[in-house]
Amino acid sequence: MATFKKFNKDKRPKRNTQSLLFKRKRFCRFTVTGVEEIDYKDVDTLRDFIAENGKIIPARLTGTRAIFQRQLNTAIKRARFLALVPYSDQHKI
């Protein structure tokens, strides 16, 4: 009967990934400032929620509440359609 040795992966030193990355407390920027509705013409605010590659940053990363995230998505899509914000990073303004 052949016996096989199990390789113990636990011998490798474990890194604490949470301490390596600085985690700040996420909060909804729109709730704090008292914004009732997000406007598609406010391009500076919209750019804060668009990644470098042109994708919309999810609420779990930005901390935006669900109601404002839906408004934000609609506003970004309207601004893209009207060419106020580029669709991707390949398009320069």
UniProtKB/Swiss-Prot annotation:
Keywords: Ribonucleoprotein, Ribosomal protein, RNA-binding, rRNA-binding. One of its GO terms (cellular component) is cytosolic small ribosomal subunit. InterPro entries: Ribosomal_bS18, Ribosomal_bS18_sf. GO terms for biological process: translation. One of its GO terms (molecular function) is structural constituent of ribosome. Pfam families: Ribosomal_S18. Binds as a heterodimer with protein bS6 to the central domain of the 16S rRNA, where it helps stabilize the platform of the 30S subunit. Part of the 30S ribosomal subunit. Forms a tight heterodimer with protein bS6. Belongs to the bacterial ribosomal protein bS18 family. This is Small ribosomal subunit protein bS18.
